């Protein structure tokens, strides 16, 4: 519709059916300025509302706190008492056969699939960034500030990520591994980890 209107006006101007009075008319310029502004506002307001609605999950099934350190991650499952661990990269010399070099960790983040997960992210020392591209997640970890992101996994699997903020000499040795499992498996894993950490 817009292209046809522009072509129509261009044709009229080329055929000189628009006089110089109508081309230089301030009323036309005023309409051409105000009308697009109104259209842009009408498009922007609902878009901003939807953007903010997508940003935060009101009632997540699980809240996880990720704390970046030089050069490892600490995870705290805030819905459980005493369920936290440090996650370090497995050195190449200790890597089991078939695992990914520089991407495998000694303790994976395990989450139930098909559940809304909120991750609260911060740092204990310098800037870090918790990024898992296959989940569409990248959030900066800033000392003294809590940032949050959320995701839902729709299938079981293992999702790899990295710290994506240059944080020092061993920046590339801060992998993130998220394992999505069915709810019964997650419940077994969390009870086993809670029991072993309380001993």
Curated annotation (Swiss-Prot):
MF annotations from Gene Ontology: copper ion binding; cytochrome-c oxidase activity
Domain of life, source organism: Eukaryota
Pfam families reported in the protein's UniProt record: COX2, COX2_TM
EC number: 7.1.1.9
Residues noted as binding Cu cation A2 in the record, renumbered to the chain: 163, 165, 167, 171
Bilayer disposition of the protein: Multi-pass membrane protein
Residues annotated to bind Cu cation A1: 128, 163, 167, 174
Transmembrane segments: 1-13, 27-54
UniProt cofactor note: Binds a dinuclear copper A center per subunit.
Entry keyword set: Copper, Electron transport, Magnesium, Membrane, Metal-binding, Mitochondrion, Mitochondrion inner membrane, Respiratory chain, Translocase, Transmembrane, Transmembrane helix, Transport
Binding residue positions for Mg(2+): 165
Location(s) in or outside the cell: Mitochondrion inner membrane
Primary localisation category: mitochondrion
Topological domains, Mitochondrial intermembrane: 55-199
Biological process annotations from GO: ATP synthesis coupled electron transport
Cofactor: Cu cation
GO terms for cellular component: mitochondrial inner membrane; respiratory chain complex IV
Mitochondrial matrix side: 14-26
Enzymatic reactions: 4 Fe(II)-[cytochrome c] + O2 + 8 H(+)(in) = 4 Fe(III)-[cytochrome c] + 2 H2O + 4 H(+)(out)
InterPro entries: CcO_II, CcO_II-like_C, CcO_II_C, Copper_CuA, Cupredoxin, Cyt_c_oxidase_su2, Cyt_c_oxidase_su2_TM_dom, Cyt_c_oxidase_su2_TM_sf
Family: Belongs to the cytochrome c oxidase subunit 2 family.
Subunit structure: Component of the cytochrome c oxidase (complex IV, CIV), a multisubunit enzyme composed of 14 subunits. The complex is composed of a catalytic core of 3 subunits MT-CO1, MT-CO2 and MT-CO3, encoded in the mitochondrial DNA, and 11 supernumerary subunits COX4I, COX5A, COX5B, COX6A, COX6B, COX6C, COX7A, COX7B, COX7C, COX8 and NDUFA4, which are encoded in the nuclear genome.
Function (record text): Component of the cytochrome c oxidase, the last enzyme in the mitochondrial electron transport chain which drives oxidative phosphorylation. The respiratory chain contains 3 multisubunit complexes succinate dehydrogenase (complex II, CII), ubiquinol-cytochrome c oxidoreductase (cytochrome b-c1 complex, complex III, CIII) and cytochrome c oxidase (complex IV, CIV), that cooperate to transfer electrons derived from NADH and succinate to molecular oxygen, creating an electrochemical gradient over the inner membrane that drives transmembrane transport and the ATP synthase.
Protein name: Cytochrome c oxidase subunit 2
Natural source organism: Apteryx australis (Southern brown kiwi)
């Amino acid at each position: 519709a817009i292209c046809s209107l522009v072509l129509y006006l261009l044709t009229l101007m080329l055929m000189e059916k628009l006089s110089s009075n109508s081309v230089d008319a301030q009323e036309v310029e005023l309409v051409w300025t105000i009308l697009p502004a109104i259209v842009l506002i009408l498009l922007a307001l609902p878009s901003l509302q939807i953007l903010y609605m997508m940003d935060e999950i009101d009632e997540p099934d699980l809240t996880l706190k990720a704390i970046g350190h030089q050069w490892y991650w600490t995870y705290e499952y805030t819905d459980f008492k005493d369920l936290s661990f440090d996650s370090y990269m497995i050195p190449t010399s200790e890597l089991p056969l078939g695992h990914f070099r520089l991407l495998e960790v000694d303790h994976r983040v395990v989450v139930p699939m098909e559940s809304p997960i909120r991750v609260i992210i911060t740092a204990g020392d310098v800037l870090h960034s918790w990024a898992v591209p296959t989940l569409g997640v990248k959030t900066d970890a800033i000392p003294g500030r809590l940032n949050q992101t959320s995701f839902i996994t729709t299938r079981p699997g293992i999702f790899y990520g990295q710290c994506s903020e240059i944080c020092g000499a061993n920046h590339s040795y801060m992998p993130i591994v998220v394992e999505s499992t069915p709810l019964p498996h997650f419940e077994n894993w969390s009870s086993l980890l809670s029991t072993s950490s309380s001993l």
